[in-house]
Amino acid sequence: ELLPVLNVRENILLPIKLNKTKVDEVYFEEIVKTLGIEEKLTSPVHKLSGGQKQRVAIARALITKPMILLADEPTGNLDRNNTLEVMELFQRCNKELDTTICMITHDQSISEMADKIIHIEDGRIENGID
C-alpha cells in the first residue's frame, strides 16, 4: 500500500530508507523512466490515477532488487502499452538481476510471456508442475 502522506519518489524509496541502504540512482532512474512516472516524482500519491499508483507500487517493489517478487495482478490497472513495459521490465529483472517473479494473472496474453505457467482452478493445481 502506498503512503498518501509521501510523494511518489518518497514512496518508491521507502524500502531503501527503512533498510538504511544506498540508493542506486541509475537503477532508480531506469525504473521510473521505464514505468513512465519520471514526471510524477514530486506529486502526492493521492493525486495519481489508479494506473499511476500501480506503476509506483511496482517501482517500489523492484527498487531493492529483490531475489523473489510476488506480484498479484501487477498489470491489472494498466493500459496495454504500460502492461507491455512492465512485463519487459520484469523480464529484464529476471535476466539481469536473476529475480524470480511469481505472478498471478487472469490475462492469457500476459501469462504467455512467462517462462513457466501453473494453472490453478478452484484452488487446485490443474497443470504446470513438473
Regions found by a protein language model. Name each.
Residues I58:
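Hydrophobic anchor residue at the start of the ABC signature
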Residues R80-N82:
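Helix N-cap at the start of a conserved alpha-helix in ABC-type nucleotide-binding domains
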